[in-house]
Amino acid sequence: MDRATLADLVVRFTEAFNANDLEGVLALMAEDAVYEEFAGAINRGKAAIRAAFVPQFRGDFGKMRFDAEDLFVDADSGKALIRWVCRLETKRGPAGWRGLDILHVENGLVTQKLTYAKAKVPLLDG
């Protein structure tokens, strides 16, 4: 996969989150993908990843959007890092935090999504 194709995959992956399209997110992930949440939980396989994302996509935490600030891709290793601001609209008003995802990609699919956030404590439970 060349650099432009990898960057495009990361953009489409992020856009699927912003479109609240869980099926679109999962379509870009390998069957045996791993998603490590910033609070430490590790989800292995699409079924576990789906279960981890359902509350977010169902709107349990409010409306969520990830605005990219930086994107670094290494096509030779199939890895990308995207730094973002998560903007959240809740019943109590707007909230947000900064974070990043390290994505490992093989054969055009995300095999690992490692999420890190800039917060003192996890902001979302569940």
Name every feature range the model reports, one short phrase each.
Residues 41-51:
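Short beta-edge strand/loop motif at the mouth of beta-sheet-based domains
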Residues 12, 29, 48, 111-113:
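Generic signature of intrinsically disordered, low-complexity, basic-rich segments
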Residues 12, 35-38:
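General structural signal for alpha-helix termini and helix-helix connectors
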Residues 1-5, 36, 50-126:
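A beta-strand edge to alpha-helix "cap/lid" segment located at domain peripheries
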Residues 1-31, 124-126:
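Short, low-complexity N-terminal intrinsically disordered segments enriched in polar/charged residues
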